Design a protein with these regions (language model features):
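Polytopic alpha-helical membrane-helix bundles and their juxtamembrane interface segments
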Residues: 1-212
Length: 212
């Protein structure tokens, strides 16, 4: 994507850091939403509308998750699920360097991690059980498919970073008490791995679409 969009999005992500643990506000929502929205704009300028759509869906998810309440959480999770489905569509459009053997090998850790959520996450999700389960299936599919492209390391790293970010977010939301001393550190790690994931996926997909 254009350098201004990549660096601008990263800079905006840095500006959001002091707002990570503040109460919801218009400014907090704006700062949380803008980084990936700028990535989306850069991807659109670079001639990748499907990638821009995936990033735009994620930006809407950021906006929803910047607010409090179950409805906002469900809206955010739905937006990110759509974003992952659009990432899947982007990956499927690649020229066809997928390695079936690598695909099967790469699936193992992702499937094991997804299955493990039935042990450490499911009992804590309450009424959100089935939305969370569906989201786990979708992001697992995106991660496995991304790792099936051995000639696209940025895509693989981006997907892995996204899975790590969502793993940490699940721990933050469902497993850590409000007064847990690790909450600030986990919140910071979620944001860093998330922005890293979006930047890597965007750059990786654009590189594959326009090699060289």
């Amino acid at each position: 994507m254009p350098l201004f969009a990549l660096l601008g999005g990263i800079a905006l992500a840095g500006l959001y850091l002091p707002w990570l643990d503040r109460a919801p506000s218009v400014m907090r929502s704006l700062l949380k939403t803008l980084p990936v929205a700028v990535f989306a704009l850069g991807s659109l300028i670079a001639g990748a509308p499907l990638l821009a759509a995936a990033l735009a869906a994620s930006a809407l998810g950021d906006l929803a998750l910047s607010r409090d309440g179950e409805r906002a959480f469900l809206a955010g999770m739905g937006a990110f699920a759509l974003g992952h489905l659009l990432y899947i569509a982007n990956i499927l459009q690649l020229s066809g360097n997928a390695n079936p053997f690598f695909f099967e090998w790469a699936a193992i850790p992702f499937l094991l991690l997804a299955a493990s959520t039935e042990i450490w996450l499911r009992p804590h999700t309450g009424a959100l059980l089935w939305p969370v389960r569906l989201y786990v299936v979708i992001i697992t599919a995106m991660g496995v498919l991304a790792l099936s492209e051995p000639d696209a390391p940025l895509i693989a790293l981006g997907a892995a970073s996204f899975v790590l970010s969502d793993l940490l977010l699940a721990i933050f939301i469902f497993r850590l008490a409000e007064d847990h001393p690790a909450r600030k550190s986990v919140s910071l790690a979620v944001w860093i791995t998330y922005i890293t994931a979006q930047a890597l996926l965007a750059e990786g997909l654009l590189t594959q679409v326009s090699p060289g």
